């Protein structure tokens, strides 16, 4: 918000600071408050960034990883540095995440998804993961989770919160 404040001060557009800064910040705060007040168990998650020639686990130092942490999720890559260096099915199986989130990068989302299918999902152990068995494998919108969503930060937080905590989906929708 500090940079937005600076630019709005320079242009004399306090209205834009309120609209694009304070209002968006309030949307995020509303989502976080709802999640915290619900006192639901923190899910173990895995965040993957896939591209046409590979895939990396991402921790909470990544934009989407930080959002997951804000929402109370426990990212298995934060506790398992080996996942950040070398994505291994053995480590994923050992940690057995409840939710798997995938963000693609690069020009071709399909090529990134093909790489995942050929190199992770083709492993027979993949289908035994809790996240896969329960249908909690999510492909995230690149506009909301790879690039900074700017005026759509509130939507990004609501989207993740609804995936992490489906019981809150109606309440989260009411915040939109």
Predicted regions and their residues:
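A ligand-binding cleft/hinge motif common to bilobed small-molecule-binding domains
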Residues: 102-120
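Extracytoplasmic/secreted cell-surface and envelope-processing proteins
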Residues: 55-57, 85, 109-113, 148-149
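Extracellular/periplasmic catalytic domains that process cell-envelope and extracellular macromolecules
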Residues: 38-41, 69, 93-95, 129-133
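Extracytoplasmic substrate-binding proteins
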Residues: 1-54, 77, 132-176
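Solvent-exposed coil/turn segments that connect beta secondary-structure elements
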Residues: 50-51, 97, 105-107, 142
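Alpha-helical, coiled-coil/dimerization segments enriched in small aliphatic residues
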Residues: 56-85
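Alpha-helical scaffolding within the catalytic cores
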Residues: 26, 33, 84-91, 119-128
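Proline-aspartate-enriched helix->loop->beta-strand connector
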Residues: 89-102
